Amino acid sequence: MDQKQIEEIVRSVMASMGQAAPAPSEAKCATTTCTTPVTSESCALDLGSAEAKAWIGVENPHRADVLTELRRSTVARVCTGRAGPRPRTQALLRFLADHSRSKDTVLKEVPEEWVKAQGLLEVRSEISDKNLYLTRPDMGRRLCAEAVEALKAQCVANPDVQVVISDGLSTDAITVNYEEILPPLMAGLKQAGLKVGTPFFVRYGRVKIEDQIGEILGAKVVILLVGERPGLGQSESLSCYAVYSPRIATTVEADRTCISNIHQGGTPPVEAAAVIVDLAKRMLEQKASGINMTR
């Protein structure tokens, strides 16, 4: 699928929702904004700001314009400079701040109030708390008994496509991107004439939990939107794992199709929704997913 096809799908989905399609994406620097890089250190600088991310720590560079262009082209830790054999103070502080932000988003919980505000049914895996979630990934792959009964009682049976949302390893990925990805995704699936299941939220879920969900509800395609493991300074990245006719006993990781890096600095959520709709349609046509699909 090329960029033109993606833009057509986005326009079609947004038109069906009565909204204007976003302008075509333009090449832009990888930092939040193209802030003019600065070289001086400041104790008062917000380490999460665009100015801090654009900071250049190399003193008296031979080609300052080259460093400026390099700094604007990536969010990687380049041009930070050294103080003898050690990193400069501001570079070290920003590293520690980014590490802290990533750690926080792993340990945070998605608020129950947020789930209720979205009108989502909430179920959970066999995990009861965050510590157990991080140490027992096997338990995060299975629904608890109460969740199984809730899905059977409250969800549409035998849908063409079942959409599931789970916190995963990043709560920010869910709460930040939800409103920009789920409405266009649901609208696009319905516009395609597909029978769409009841979307719901799984607390403490791992990727493989979608196999049990698909088996319980009899879904042809299961789409799991889950928070990615955060990187340094990037805690809002969402992934989509889609699988055709999942089964607990037989589905393996190669059967899944993954779309990752969904966030404003990567694949925009609205664009990702359009790609997922097209992916679901192709899965149903080919009756396959993962490495079994033909391009």
UniProtKB/Swiss-Prot annotation:
Q: What is its EC number?
A: 4.3.1.7
Name the coenzymes or cofactors required. adenosylcob(III)alamin
* Localization (cell): Bacterial microcompartment
* Cofactor: binding details: Binds between the large and small subunits.
Question: What GO cellular component term, any one, is given?
Answer: ethanolamine ammonia-lyase complex
Q: Which residues bind adenosylcob(III)alamin?
A: V207, E228, C258
What is catalyzed by this enzyme? ethanolamine = acetaldehyde + NH4(+)
Q: In which pathway does it act?
A: Amine and polyamine degradation; ethanolamine degradation
Tell me which Pfam families the record gives. EutC
Keyword check for Metal-binding: no
Q: Which InterPro entries match?
A: EutC, EutC_C
Q: Which UniProt keywords apply?
A: Bacterial microcompartment, Cobalamin, Cobalt, Lyase
According to the UniProt record, what class of enzyme is this? Answer: lyase
> Subunit notes for this chain?
The basic unit is a heterodimer which dimerizes to form tetramers. The heterotetramers trimerize; 6 large subunits form a core ring with 6 small subunits projecting outwards.
Q: Which family does it belong to?
A: Belongs to the EutC family.
Please identify the protein, giving its name as recorded.
Answer: Ethanolamine ammonia-lyase small subunit
